[in-house]
Amino acid sequence: MEQWRQCGRWLIDCKVLPPNHRVVWPSAVVFDLAQALRDGVLLCQLLHNLSPGSIDLKDINFRPQMSQFLCLKNIRTFLKVCHDKFGLRNSELFDPFDLFDVRDFGKVISAVSRLSLHSIAQSKGIRPFPSEETAENDDDVYRSLEELADEHDLGEDIYDCVPCEDEGDDIYEDIIKVEVQQPMKMGMTEDDKRSCCLLEIQETEAKYYRTLEDIEKNYMGPLRLVLSPADMAAVFINLEDLIKVHHSFLRAIDVSMMAGGSTLAKVFLEFKERLLIYGEYCSHMEHAQSTLNQLLASREDFRQKVEECTLRVQDGKFKLQDLLVVPMQRVLKYHLLLKELLSHSADRPERQQLKEALEAMQDLAMYINEVKRDKETLKKISEFQCSIENLQVKLEEFGRPKIDGELKVRSIVNHTKQDRYLFLFDKVVIVCKRKGYSYELKEVIELLFHKMTDDPMHNKDIKKWSYGFYLIHLQGKQGFQFFCKTEDMKRKWMEQFEMAMSNIKPDKANANHHSFQMYTFDKTTNCKACKMFLRGTFYQGYLCTRCGVGAHKECLEVIPPCKMSSPADVDAPGAGPGPKMVAVQNYHGNPAPPGKPVLTFQTGDVIELLRGDPDSPWWEGRLVQTRKSGYFPSSSVKPCPVDGRPPTGRPPSREIDYTAYPWFAGNMERQQTDNLLKSHASGTYLIRERPAEAERFAISIKFNDEVKHIKVVEKDSWIHITEAKKFESLLELVEYYQCHSLKESFKQLDTTLKFPYKSRERTTSRASSRSPASCASYNFSFLSPQGLSFAPQAPSAPFWSVFTPRVIGTAVARYNFAARDMRELSLREGDVVKIYSRIGGDQGWWKGETNGRIGWFPSTYVEEEGVQ
């Protein structure tokens, strides 16, 4: 058996991998194991399992997500503990990039093998590896893994549970189970079932409250004698406040039950705000467990005291660590209990109030999960902060991190391509130079003042680090070009940039005359539209800077009109439109209106005036064509003619007839173009139409025995092949590049547009058509590993092959949801969602597909079909 397979089985024996992990499937390949280990989480978990306490769980980033920084930090933590605690020499270990980039996976396997032979591992009774029957010459199987790593993501199941929390639900069931509860039987009436549900809510709440009292009486009281106030607060968090709330909560439930339970929904609605304190408890739970474990390991007096206390609670059946998990599990059960009660209350007069109570507890669960998630995010941001030199601002002010990693960066001004490490946040991209394990700050680029555009070059360059895109300043200042290692990496970075920009500049930010900005709310705030919480601890939603209301991203378009807008801002029923103006010059936002949103336009655009003081240099208006509103210089417009039509200007490029020009080929497919131009001399070119594509025109040119294709972008009445140089017409563009080399835009295309194809004599007969495989393709495609087919796979196929996920259910979206992250799935009310995974359901997230996209979505935002 190959050594990597033995390694996988050993990790299963160490309870690091589950018994049915894909590494033991017959179809498994070595990359399956490499991919499982690349983020360092499982290796750190391995050390914890072999020697509890050898590694501080606080040092592990259990959800590194899209962060190279956090993955490498995990790997370095593993290597340090192997050296310091297990005594492995540096020569017996590996470089972090040997694993992260899978440069030398053989060294990783060798290091894990040495751990398996260590006396600590041997004491567990687990057979080490390799065994004598190891297959020889494993080196061949490790080749090409680095290329596979370039093409495949790390695992992104970011909403599942942290490994050390998996048993929490079982602990809850053991502690809170109610022995007197009878299972529902066949033949029971709906009233009987409803009574069972009511009884379960009451009795489990009573059992839970007794558990809280046990913790207070038998642990908190005695341990105050041996712990400092700071340690007490770290271990028990705000448990005293929880106990006070649940004393009142249980009394209210009991009173409702004495009246038949018809007012139980009202009780939950009344206590929703008071239960928000669970956000603090749950977000500090991990730190509390870590502090408790450290105290138990470092202080013998404390350990003995805890053992004495444990014997007083249910005969020592549960440890303090177990009991501290129960509050987090309990608060996330309320919506499940109410959902079951609602399903047996079809004809009850309080049904509507029960629905409202269910939604309230679902909202509470989502709020608590997001607070916990934000605490983890802030921890990651703090680690970034400590690693970047010369950083004078708090990174958390820039929103949530999206992605980080190594790119090459070139300033559009000086054209020097440099190796840089980027941290992308919602608001900025931090550009750094890597210095060992730290980073030197080079640039902070504010995304609000930039737009991203693709490098329009069609052809793939076979060299790495040649896949580029632009970040262009909206006011013509310095821009940047970024280069990625692979096309897939470029796609991921561009998607994350798009998501970040949509967070700080959402499409509906000015809907109904509001002026919404992403904002951190100091107090718990409800969305003005849906009335649900704005969730988390920072940048929870959007604040209107005019009227002060808060909203979710997905609710911006349905917020009632802004109350602080002037009458001219609102389309009053029956009121006529404001005076129309026509733009007499282009305005792209420079100069910018002080503290106001910008309205950009082109010469000839018609603008409806919303607010305009004759003595003011700035007016507010709305473009008639797009309905977009904002501020602009009053000197850039003049009154429109009475009929409302703008003066005659130049016709758009789509209305110009280019057929007389010797370079215009009309409608022509890419393959046909290749066949036509390959027999011509270098520098021969044509312009062709692409009617089925978003960009209508493309330049095709023969250069160094290859045909290159460049799309021509038409946007905002300008036409260009690169953002750095724009033209008013296609003819102007062609005339420019007849005299200037394309190298200005594309480094490897050092040629002008020399010979229009119609004016050149054919020099040779056409060669036979190229095969499809030989044609350059701009579309993303997988690089198929040798020996693997990407045809439909059997259930045992490697997880990184192309496959159709198994649908385990369907649901209908009850609310709109706007993704804040590329891993999330946006929903519109009424969308039918295919459910692929409920892993992470206790964290509030399911995985599914709708509208052609796959991602994670809040489980409480959908109603599962076929489930009563």
Swiss-Prot record:
An annotated Gene Ontology molecular function: zinc ion binding
Quaternary form?
Interacts (via SH2 domains) with the phosphorylated form of EPHA2. Interacts with NEK3 and PRLR and this interaction is prolactin-dependent. Interacts with SSX2IP.
Q: Where are the zinc fingers (Phorbol-ester/DAG-type)?
A: 513-562
Identify the residues that the record assigns to the SH3 domain, covering every copy: 576-642, 806-867
Carrying Phosphotyrosine, the residues are: 142, 159, 172
Q: Where is the DH domain positioned along the sequence? A: 193-371
* Post-translational modification summary for this protein: Phosphorylated on tyrosine residues in response to FGR activation.
Q: Where is the PH domain?
A: 400-502
**Calponin-homology (CH) domain location, by residue?**
1-120
Q: Which cysteines are joined by disulfide bonds?
A: none
Question: Which purpose does this protein serve, as stated in its record?
Answer: Guanine nucleotide exchange factor for the Rho family of Ras-related GTPases. Plays an important role in angiogenesis. Its recruitment by phosphorylated EPHA2 is critical for EFNA1-induced RAC1 GTPase activation and vascular endothelial cell migration and assembly.
Query: Has the keyword Transcription been applied to this entry?
Result: no
Task: Please name the PROSITE patterns in this protein's record.
Answer: CH, DH_1, DH_2, PH_DOMAIN, SH2, SH3, ZF_DAG_PE_1, ZF_DAG_PE_2
Q: Which organism is it from?
A: Mus musculus (Mouse)
Domain (SH2) spans 663-757
- Recorded protein name is Guanine nucleotide exchange factor VAV2
Sites bearing Phosphoserine, chain numbering: 566, 616
Q: Which UniProt keywords apply?
A: Angiogenesis, Guanine-nucleotide releasing factor, Metal-binding, Phosphoprotein, Repeat, SH2 domain, SH3 domain, Zinc, Zinc-finger
